[in-house]
């Protein structure tokens, strides 16, 4: 079957059914939700613009698709119960809440749904248009060999991207000019084992660890069946859809060839784009790849026992078998499907990335599902080639496939065309938890043996699909958005050369908190905003990100400032009972309300200079209860102000008064980190590796405990001396190493190799009157990302101004204007592990903006005591 032909067949299916390999249909004009996950951009091609979720469930033996944007608004258990009661037994689906409200409602809804949820899908939309010289008629799929789509559906084709949209009047006057919407869709972990009372099960798998690739795209489309269509150029065939019969007219030969030529360019570009994403994921993960090639063949086959035979008749679809062989990468599975009738499938390529290879075999069955265990040699190959422990491979590689030989008739409602067994049979992709309960031999899965079931492990990569829908006018496929900022100058921070990515006449469009377009107004797609803002040539940048602060504390250390002016050093003050331990005493004595009241003015000062995201570290409690208190107050700050707070546990900030460093380190690792991770109070663990704090070995002990509990790693390193802490942190994949004034070449090389961000803190350098400048030139030459932060703290950097920190970095560290602005946006997002959705103006990113009254970007760095902020935007909302 051809690629567009298969896409056309998929588009024509009723919305209540899935297509082969478990991919569901979608609505004509989705009103997308915004899941947590953003797809990585490819090296070229359009960028992900809008996200939408789909839940696939089974009802009365048939597959139903549920759009996430159909869920009624609400949060928590009550909303989930209410939605389930209201929608139970209907085809309408879930529905809901914006991603900013989390997935609580969705989890509770699925937990109480009588239908069994089988898969959760996400999709990203791209927008482009057909070149004016390409003439493609509407309903292009009508020329497909067997008339897959009814006339009322939108045409399906593959279109070249990148051309500017035609004007409305030209497009409206010519029905051959069409605009396109392209969807890339992925399936993620299914909430198949949600606890019905509490709804405890995340919808998405955890972040990939070392050696795992975090992104996977698989193309599930073939090419056009041009020859078959030409052979029946004027033939009229009947296509039954329930009680309705529609006649499909074949298009002339030249139109079919013309359409095929138009399709080829974008198919090639789509393949290259998705391959680029896959290769980037593999490079990041450092893992191998294995390919499963499923070759679906067709042949004429008469089934005398069913009374089926002859060309064009109804046929039986069944599996002919599968061969498994080993390769250098592990196992390559070649699957051959034999299908009667008129099916003409092309090759399907499914690539498995990461550390899971699956060895299975396919057997025809009549009434039961047989458990098919992975071949021992395949498990050994997977373990050897991908570094996965053997027991984990055995637990996670349970793949079961059941296919009954049954008769599929072309007239069956919603089962696709004749001769296509895979399309006619309902198919489901069911992702299980890491240790699935395997059914006993003979036990049926929901839906019975007529369904193809593919049970995969928790670590199985996502599957995606490229579909293109064409529209006759720009307005028909206009990109709907909530807010549009226009007549602006942009600093996108998304330039290929690492610069500011300046756009002179720019536009930013936002839909449900995500950017759907950011770039030149002249190249913007057709947009239909609900609200518009004329920026009057002001500058728009990503919202500022302060990636290193100690914002939550009590007390005042102005007396230490006076001591430092008289010549006392940091070590002298600490030895006299001052420094960090002085703030520890004050913070322990303060309750939540006092800490909150003391922290709010500092936070407000940062927000007033365009900060939309900041990290807040603990570290002034040094007991479990007091550290939790600090993290709890950090969460309260995020609830009281429109800002995203990233909490970091810094229990290993200093040794408590009268304590022992090793004994306290053991307490941090065995008591504090497990408790804080269990409560979800922190995303990362930091440690102060210095001769007056924690040693190299103790820092490593903290890192091991943090990784064991799934927390990111950060470090205060080389601030006062070279303890080789940055090199250690890089070895453990740390997000960032901060301060690093005394960093040596070995540490620079380690950070460059690991992608660890260098967080520079000019405020602390200035305030302590340090003379050891961080090795900026060497870091720059090695390609280490350079982030900036205020290091807001009471002792060494009582600074709440990111704009002043930029000026200090330029003046003291000789950083460029571009580096200073990138340090508080793009690179700061990377230091917090949020580069996929923050720090740049790009489709698919969170719509966090700072709008400035300046003449040029250099004004942000050049002027001191100057605040040119005009407006701050968080998730598309003015603050």
From Swiss-Prot:
Keywords: Cytoplasm, Histidine metabolism, Hydrolase, Iron, Metal-binding, Zinc. One of its GO terms (cellular component) is cytoplasm. Residues 1-478 are annotated as: Unknown. Fe(3+) binds at residues 548, 550, 716, 791. Transmembrane segments: none annotated. 4-imidazolone-5-propanoate binds at residues 557, 620, 653, 719, 796. It is an enzyme of class 3 (hydrolase). Pfam families: Amidohydro_3. InterPro entries: Amidohydro_3 (IPR013108), HutI (IPR005920), Metal-dep_hydrolase_composite (IPR011059), Metal_Hydrolase (IPR032466). The keyword Ligase does not apply. GO terms for molecular function: imidazolonepropionase activity; iron ion binding; zinc ion binding. Pathway: Amino-acid degradation; L-histidine degradation into L-glutamate; N-formimidoyl-L-glutamate from L-histidine: step 3/3. GO terms for biological process: L-histidine catabolic process to glutamate and formamide; L-histidine catabolic process to glutamate and formate. Residues 1-32 are annotated as: Disordered. Binds 1 zinc or iron ion per subunit. The keyword Hydrolase applies. Its EC number is 3.5.2.7. Zn(2+) binds at residues 548, 550, 716, 791. SUPFAM superfamilies: Composite domain of metallo-dependent hydrolases, Metallo-dependent hydrolases. It catalyses: 4-imidazolone-5-propanoate + H2O = N-formimidoyl-L-glutamate. Its cofactor is Zn(2+); Fe(3+). Catalyzes the hydrolytic cleavage of the carbon-nitrogen bond in imidazolone-5-propanoate to yield N-formimidoyl-L-glutamate. It is the third step in the universal histidine degradation pathway. PANTHER family: IMIDAZOLONEPROPIONASE (PTHR42752), IMIDAZOLONEPROPIONASE-RELATED (PTHR42752:SF1). Belongs to the metallo-dependent hydrolases superfamily. HutI family. This is Imidazolonepropionase. It comes from Xanthomonas oryzae pv. oryzae (strain KACC10331 / KXO85). The lineage of its organism: Bacteria, Pseudomonadati, Pseudomonadota, Gammaproteobacteria, Lysobacterales.
